[in-house]
From Swiss-Prot:
CDD domains: enolase. (2R)-2-phosphoglycerate binds at residues 164, 338, 367-368, 389. The gene is eno. This is Enolase. GO terms for biological process: glycolytic process. It comes from the Archaea. Its EC number is 4.2.1.11. It comes from Pyrococcus abyssi (strain GE5 / Orsay).
């Protein structure tokens, strides 16, 4: 009999993401299953990320992905046909070899990742296992705390806020279903609070479903969030905590950080973070310093790391080499895991395990340009990461992930555990 797990076809196509830009979708077929995956793309990208291949030229304003699609159909597909779909690590290694560059710029990380994820889904479907169980085994049962980005600034918004994301974290909930209800209720109250204060035009939503009101000072969104949490009937800090993504590389100029029109040195910016974390119930800060300011990350981790999670996104770009450097230096204490920053599922999972071994937290994350693909929801549970960052509870591209987590929790009824206040150290 033919091998039911043999890859018989790999087909790529160009589809649209949540911003209306093209992205890559891939189907991987075996005689008994099919796996489909579509890849996201980011607006604020780290310099060291794997390269997303775009066509240039007039079509789609240069953002077409026909070259990446062709690389899958003409170069990758012939090599994969005949391989066993369950050999994820071998397939990912082959994809890396076929590309032959450090940053996947030859075939494109968007082409490679779409194939890598579709292979995993086809294997899970062939084995009749949910994806989280196929990737994580019987120990995958922790539902993550959502870091829900409800107020946008920086490159995600058209306002004057320098920090990019202001998030709420329902750490006091007892289940994921309850957590997402708290987030949704707070989000709707927030909409009302913002509209009352800034007018109804201030509640248009950004790429990730958050609001982008005309705010300038970093304390404004924090004050509004506290008000919304309280008006929704929850206790700030105890039930719903706050998190920030400063995305500092975006406001770093000539050796200085410029926040709300004011210049800060590294030391002064650290003082600002200390002030904010002592005034507001902030439990996590992402990219507090520039992606090459390792010293800044070491300082803030030393000073605030016990109380606050310090997350490296642009700092690490999900890259094991940069993560290793951070661990050795004591820079940050958590990794933001974006599969498209590194380009294969195996490398992303390896980075997560490296972080866990060092006692670092892991936050599985979306990108600002998303699709209806909900793979990261399964990945968060597979890794028992305890945290997921996938936008506000609005826009179907964001809710696709939340809805998948609701389904997973239902499927794991009786064994599912919501990470809650243990989001940083799920098992320790």
């Amino acid at each position: 009999m033919e091998n039911p797990y043999e890859i018989v076809a790999v087909i790529a196509r160009e589809i649209l993401d949540s911003r209306g830009n093209p992205t890559v979708e891939v189907d991987v077929h075996t005689p008994i299953s099919m796996g489909r995956a579509a890849v996201p793309s980011g607006a604020s990208t780290g310099t060291h990320e794997a390269v997303e291949l775009r066509d240039g030229g007039k079509r789609y304003h240069g953002k077409g992905v026909r070259r990446a699609v062709e690389n899958v159909n003409k170069i990758i597909a012939p090599e994969l046909v005949g391989m066993d779909v369950r050999w994820q690590r071998e397939i990912d290694r082959l994809l890396i070899e076929l590309d032959g560059t450090e940053n996947k710029s030859n075939l494109g990380a968007n082409a490679i990742l779409a194939v890598s994820l579709a292979v995993a889904k086809a294997a899970a479907n062939a084995l009749e296992l949910p994806l989280y169980q196929y990737l994580g085994g019987v120990n995958a049962y922790v539902l993550p705390v959502p870091l829900s980005n409800v107020i946008n600034g920086g490159v995600h918004a058209g306002n004057d806020l320098d920090f990019q994301e202001f998030m709420i974290m329902p750490i006091g909930a007892n289940s994921f279903r309850e957590a997402i209800r708290w987030v949704s209720e707070t989000y709707h109250v927030l909409k009302k609070v913002i509209a009352e204060k800034y007018g109804k035009n201030a509640v248009n939503v950004g790429d990730e479903g958050g609001f982008a009101p005309p705010m300038k000072e970093v304390t404004e969104p924090l004050d509004v969030l506290i008000k919304a949490i309280e008006e929704a009937g929850y206790k700030p800090g105890e039930e719903i905590a706050l998190a920030l993504d400063a995305a500092s590389s975006e406001f770093y100029k000539d050796g200085k950080y410029i926040v709300s029109g004011k210049e800060y040195t590294r030391e002064e910016l650290l003082e600002l973070y200390k002030e904010l974390t002592s005034t507001y119930p902030i439990v996590s800060i992402e990219d507090p310093f520039h992606e090459e300011d390792w010293e800044g990350f070491v300082m803030i981790t030393r000073e605030l790391g016990k109380k606050v999670q310090i997350v490296g996104d642009d700092l690490f770009v999900t890259n094991p080499k940069r993560l290793k450097k951070g661990i050795e230096m004591g820079a940050a204490n958590a990794l933001l895991l974006k599969v498209n920053q590194i380009g294969t599922l195996t490398e992303a999972m390896d980075a997560a395990y490296m972080a866990f071994r060092a006692g670092y937290g892991v936050v599985v994350s979306h990108r600002s340009g998303e699709t209806e693909d909900a793979t990261i929801a399964d990945l968060a549970v597979a890794l028992n990461a305890g945290q997921i960052k996938t936008g506000a509870p609005a826009r179907s591209d964001r809710n696709a992930k939340y809805n998948q987590l609701i389904r997973i929790e239902e499927e794991l009824e009786g064994v599912a555990v919501y990470a809650g206040k243990n989001f940083r150290k799920v098992f320790f």
